[in-house]
Amino acid sequence: MKGGKRIQFTRPNRINNEIRAIKVRLTGVEGDQIGIVNLREALEKAEELGLDLVEISPNAEPPVCRIMDYGKFLYEKSKSSKEQKKKQKVIQVKEIKFRPSTDEGDYQVKLRNLIRFLEDGDKVKITLRFRGREMAHQKIGIDVLNRVKNDLIELAIIESFPSKIEGRQMIMVLAPKKK
C-alpha cells in the first residue's frame, strides 16, 4: 500500500467523543432544556436514544450540546440552503443593439425581445451604435431611444438615459417595474 497524507475532514460541529468539555448544558431532542450534566451522562443519554450528541455552541460556558440525529440535521441544513439558493433570482443585464437606421421589422423584433427580458425580471442595456456619417445625425439616434422609452413606459423604469454620445455609441439602461 502506498502511504501518504490523509485529508482530514472537519465537521462544522463536534459530535459524540469529539466533544472536549467536562460538563455541558444539555438540550433534548425536542429542544427542551435538560440542564448542566457531565459529558459522560450526556453521551449515555444520547446512546440510549440511538442518537448523537452534537456540540451546538462551543464558546458558551458550559458548551451547549443537543441530542439529535446528526446525519438528518446535516441533510435538513443542506436542503434548506439549496431552497434558499433556488429562491434567489440573479438579475442579469441583457444587451440589445440598435442603429439609427434600424428598420421597422427589426425594431419590432428587438422590442419583442426587450419586453421578454423585462418580463423575466432582467435589466436591459440598449446600445445605439453610430458608424461613419451617422455621427452627424445624432438627433436620429436620440429619437430612436425616445421611441424605445415610450414603447416600454408601462414595463420599465429608465435607470440612465444618455445626455451625450460616448465614443461612437449612446447607452440607455432600463430596469423592470416592480409588480
UniProtKB/Swiss-Prot annotation:
Record has Cytoplasm as a keyword: yes
Swiss-Prot/TrEMBL site (Important for 30S binding) positions: 107, 110
GO cellular component, one term: membrane
Annotated GO biological process: ribosome disassembly
Keyword Isomerase tagged: no
Keyword annotations from UniProtKB, A to Z: Cytoplasm, Initiation factor, Protein biosynthesis
Localization (cell): Cytoplasm
Gene3D superfamilies found in the cross-reference section: Translation initiation factor 3 (IF-3), C-terminal domain, Translation initiation factor 3 (IF-3), N-terminal domain
Entry GO MF terms: ribosome binding; translation initiation factor activity
Subunit structure: Monomer.
Role this protein plays: IF-3 binds to the 30S ribosomal subunit and shifts the equilibrium between 70S ribosomes and their 50S and 30S subunits in favor of the free subunits, thus enhancing the availability of 30S subunits on which protein synthesis initiation begins.
Stated family: Belongs to the IF-3 family.
Protein name as catalogued: Translation initiation factor IF-3
Organism annotation: Buchnera aphidicola subsp. Schizaphis graminum (strain Sg)
Gene label: infC
